[in-house]
Curated annotation (Swiss-Prot):
Highest taxon, organism lineage: Eukaryota
UniProt protein name: Protein trichome birefringence-like 38
InterPro entries found in the cross-reference section: TBL (IPR029962), TBL_C (IPR026057), TBL_N (IPR025846)
Record's miscellaneous remark: Contains 2 motifs that are conserved in esterases, but it is unlikely that this protein belongs to the catalytically active pectin esterases.
DCXHWCLPGXXDXWN motif, short sequence motif: residues: 357-371
Known function: May act as a bridging protein that binds pectin and other cell wall polysaccharides. Probably involved in maintaining esterification of pectins. May be involved in the specific O-acetylation of cell wall polymers.
Membrane topology (UniProt): Single-pass type II membrane protein
Residues annotated as transmembrane: 7-29
A GO term, aspect molecular function: O-acetyltransferase activity
Length: 380
């Protein structure tokens, strides 16, 4: 039934409106504590919820406060045996000589994250649908989860369909489908007389495909910062105003607020668990971790300790502000600080395109920990 529905969506999505451009088309064109979120994630399984602007400290362990420790049992899988990894994330394939970056696990301060079990995941979510919605960091996380599950059931029959904007991977025996919907801004980009317009108040292009999922994981931020040739729009529509540009944090706040209203109005959270993937950091500016003139290139170890020298980015504050205003419970996967500590985990020059990528993450690698935390939130 799920595949028939998605097939129909794929057939009719281009007909909904020729003016709505998928976020991925734009992408390919140039392509601490959780106290103010809709739901805290602690060792009590994230059952402590917040409403409105109330702040309440949950009991138990904060899974996102901790440090990286060497772990010889890692990684979860062999990249050469996973058929779902894009070249841009396959660092070992493109010659990364060191492998120490694969051997770190995240250790919270006062509890233990359950080790990921792909077979248990498939059994628990038999017949269920899990969707990642966002930019290429969502792609990073989607492919990571696919590889983690595949490593547990390497002989399982799968159906893999990769398209723009909607891709699917189904583990047939279990009826579990992982979806990826590529839309870098979440809100719409439309083609108008003046050019490409980023509409901060509209979510129409493809949002119906997000409905009726069992798990939704949203992500957005990186594309809001792009300028020049990599910018995905020509104008911004802010209410009745059409402007060439505006403060990017303000634009992100308004766009994310539109997403929040969409979730509040369209998602039955009694049936669907909703997550927002916290801001994924970049490592182009070494001064952020007290190594001026350095980037992620040549980095071979994570930062020690449990905090990042320059602190969290302002965009994380925007996410917290929006989530705290929502009526429906949304769980923040607060992966920002733990990811900031992993300056060693980017493709750098081993992403296959000849550039230096300090934005995405190698697979195997850091996104496996994001999925381990997602697994913890779903099972603990």
């Amino acid at each position: 039934m799920g595949f028939k529905l998605i097939s129909l969506l794929l057939l009719f999505l281009p007909l909904l409106t020729v003016t709505i451009l998928s976020g991925v088309e734009q992408a390919f064109a140039s392509d601490k504590a959780l106290l103010v979120t809709g739901r805290n994630i602690t060792a009590d399984g994230g059952r402590s919820s917040l409403r409105g602007k109330k702040q309440r400290r949950a009991s138990g362990c904060n899974l996102f406060q901790g440090r990286w420790v060497f772990d010889a049992s890692y990684p979860f899988y062999d990249s050469s045996k996973c058929p779902f990894i894009d070249g841009e994330f396959d660092c070992l394939k493109f010659g990364r000589p060191d492998k120490q970056f694969l051997k770190y696990s995240w250790q919270p301060e006062s509890c233990t994250i359950p080790r990921f079990d792909g077979g248990a995941f498939l059994r628990k979510y038999r017949g269920k649908r899990v969707m990642f919605v966002g930019d290429s960091l969502s792609l990073n996380m989607w492919e990571s989860l696919a590889c983690m599950i595949h490593a547990s059931v390497p002989n399982a029959k799968t159906t893999f369909l990769k398209r723009t904007p909607l891709s699917t991977l189904t583990f047939q025996e279990y009826g579990v489908t992982l979806y990826l919907y590529r839309t870098p801004y979440i809100v719409d980009i439309s083609k108008e007389r003046v050019g490409r317009v980023l509409n901060l108040g509209a979510i129409e292009g493809g949002a119906d495909a997000w409905k009726n999922m069992d798990v939704l994981v949203f992500n957005s931020w990186h594309w809001w910062t792009h300028k020049g040739q990599s910018q995905g729009w020509d104008y911004i529509r802010d209410g009745s105003s059409l402007v060439r540009d505006m403060n990017r944090l303000d634009a992100f706040y308004k766009g994310l607020s539109t997403w929040a209203r969409w979730v509040d109005q369209n998602v039955d959270t009694a049936k669907t668990r909703v997550f927002f993937q916290g801001i994924s950091p970049t490592h182009y500016e070494g001064r952020e971790w007290n190594e001026p003139r350095k980037t992620c290139s040549g980095q071979m170890q994570p930062l020690g300790g449990s905090s990042y020298p320059s602190g969290q980015p302002p965009s994380s504050g925007v996410v917290s502000k929006v989530l705290s205003s929502m009526k429906k419970p949304v769980t923040l996967l607060d992966i920002t600080t733990l990811s900031q500590l992993r300056k060693d985990a980017h493709p750098s020059s081993y992403g296959g395109d000849g550039g230096t990528d300090c934005s995405h993450w190698c697979l195997p690698g850091l996104p496996d920990t994001w999925n381990q935390l997602l697994y913890a939130a779903l099972t603990m």
